[in-house]
Amino acid sequence: MAAKLKKGDKVVVLTGKDKGKQGEISAVFPKENKAVVDGINIAIRHQRQTQTSQGGRVAKAMPIDLSNLALLDKNGKATRVGFREEDGKKVRFAKTTGDVI
């Protein structure tokens, strides 16, 4: 099955501590059904000092389940994603507006 959400998509968080926040997907893990969104689901990780990097507490965006994310359409509203064929190619489209993503 094709991915409904891809790297670079603008999304909004539907549930959890970051509900309502918006961000851009920076990485997708299809096997785990998760994605990393910039500025969302931030956790503090303790990093050991090395010769190249300084140690300490580092804020890191952790993966969030794809079911907790919704794509933002051109109007800035959350939408579901559908697939259809146009000119022999499978394309994604926003179900609220019908526009190709």
Swiss-Prot record:
Keywords: Ribonucleoprotein, Ribosomal protein, RNA-binding, rRNA-binding
InterPro entries in UniProt: KOW, Rib_uL2_dom2, Ribosomal_uL24, Ribosomal_uL24_CS, Ribosomal_uL24_KOW, Translation_prot_SH3-like_sf
SMART domains attached to this UniProt entry: KOW (SM00739)
Entry-linked CDD domains: KOW_RPL26
MF term (GO), any: structural constituent of ribosome
GO CC term, one of those recorded: ribosome
Keyword Magnesium: no
One BP term from GO: translation
Gene3D superfamilies in alphabetical order: 2.30.30.30
Xref: SUPFAM superfamilies: Translation proteins SH3-like domain
Family under the similarity heading: Belongs to the universal ribosomal protein uL24 family.
Complex formation: Part of the 50S ribosomal subunit.
Known role: One of two assembly initiator proteins, it binds directly to the 5'-end of the 23S rRNA, where it nucleates assembly of the 50S subunit. One of the proteins that surrounds the polypeptide exit tunnel on the outside of the subunit.
Name assigned to this protein: Large ribosomal subunit protein uL24
